[in-house]
Amino acid sequence: MSSIFWIDLQPSVFCFNKKLACILSQSRHVRRWSFQHDLDEICSLSTIFDFLRETVDQLDSPPHVVAHGLSGTIASLFARQFPKLFGSLTLISVDPISTNQWSSHYLEMRRKLPCSRSSILSHIVPLLFDKQFNQTNLALSGFFEKCLDFDFIPGSIASHSLLPNL
């Protein structure tokens, strides 16, 4: 049975993928891939592709790739550019038409509204999860705050380039 290569560009929200990763790991070896960068440095799509290609080139055979959200968008764009490097690609919660992500909505709202980060996240979380529970919303907002502070977000200081549509 072949292994799974899980691309994870936003480790702060891996908790949403953990259950599936654990289930898959019962029958296959699951390898998680991410990278760290200094958030004060620009991180372009080509930088991510270079890191990803360097890792994939070291594998014995093209991996079966799983990716969620933004990671899935990046994986799809990578697979389009380097089709022979992935054995297969499974995308979870990826907009098949565009590169629209929760972070796109967050950044747009921050640009247009005179609201705090926490106010905007408190508004976005119930839209994403259909939850109206304050405790749950606070916890989920915390995950997204960590993601904004530490993970790759297109359009933030970490990346000045927009992602092309799929």
Where is each model-derived feature located?
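Conserved acidic catalytic loop of the alpha/beta-hydrolase fold
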Residues: 46-63
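Gly/Ala-rich beta-loop-alpha elbow adjacent to hydrolase catalytic centers
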Residues: 66-75
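Conserved alpha/beta-hydrolase catalytic His-Asp/Glu region
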Residues: 100-102, 117-165
